[in-house]
């Protein structure tokens, strides 16, 4: 009889030993898997002088890509930019509309995967999210972001601050939440290299 209740925050594997009435022992391997994965990622400007406004994941080296390659190899494709003409309003942008930032003369490309963003700030605590059904519920309850510039509704999470919570849905139908852990903004100091740190929880592939 097993009476312990386990609360998981990561995938686990256990060996269970069983004794029968004749005191014979056998063992079994028990694998316990979450239906979400959690990780932290930092996006950093790719130019030494922090002038490119192209933010990339140092772990994978892929531009516009939020991923923990071991736990979420498919990743979440998005961009990180600032309001045009305003260096203190950080935004996440769906990659299929990133050309609208004005930072790059990108050709409209409907083949780029989309991400839909909603504002989940004050709706949930990041550490309390531990299953996929939570993520869809959070997304459904979250507020729509105001549309800025000529973005399609839901394609930009604007004017981010530290501790903000961003609910999202990927093009392949996975739900997730990102917490803005830290923003190193443009022009805040002379050594600024423009980074954003995100805590991510997302449905597994």
PLM region descriptions:
Residues 1, 5-205:
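Surface-exposed, beta-sheet-biased, low-hydrophobicity segments with strongly acidic/polar composition
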């Amino acid at each position: 009889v097993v009476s312990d209740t386990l609360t998981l925050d990561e995938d686990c594997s256990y060996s269970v030993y069983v004794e029968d009435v004749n005191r014979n022992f056998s063992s079994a391997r028990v694998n316990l898997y979450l239906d979400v994965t959690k990780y932290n990622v930092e996006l950093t400007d790719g130019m030494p002088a922090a002038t490119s406004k192209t933010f990339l994941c140092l772990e994978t080296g892929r531009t516009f890509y939020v991923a923990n390659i071991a736990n979420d190899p498919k990743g979440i494709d998005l961009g990180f930019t600032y309001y045009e003409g305003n260096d203190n309003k950080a935004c996440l942008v769906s990659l299929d509309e990133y050309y609208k930032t004005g930072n790059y003369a990108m050709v409209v490309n409907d083949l780029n995967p989309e991400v839909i963003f909603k504002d989940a700030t004050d709706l949930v605590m990041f550490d309390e999210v531990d299953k996929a059904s939570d993520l869809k519920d959070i997304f459904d309850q979250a507020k729509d972001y105001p549309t800025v510039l000529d973005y399609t509704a839901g394609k930009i999470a604007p004017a981010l601050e530290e501790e903000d919570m961003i609910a999202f849905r990927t093009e392949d139908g996975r739900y997730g939440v990102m917490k803005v852990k830290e923003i190193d903004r443009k022009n805040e100091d002379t050594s600024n290299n423009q980074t954003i740190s995100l805590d991510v929880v997302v449905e597994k592939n």
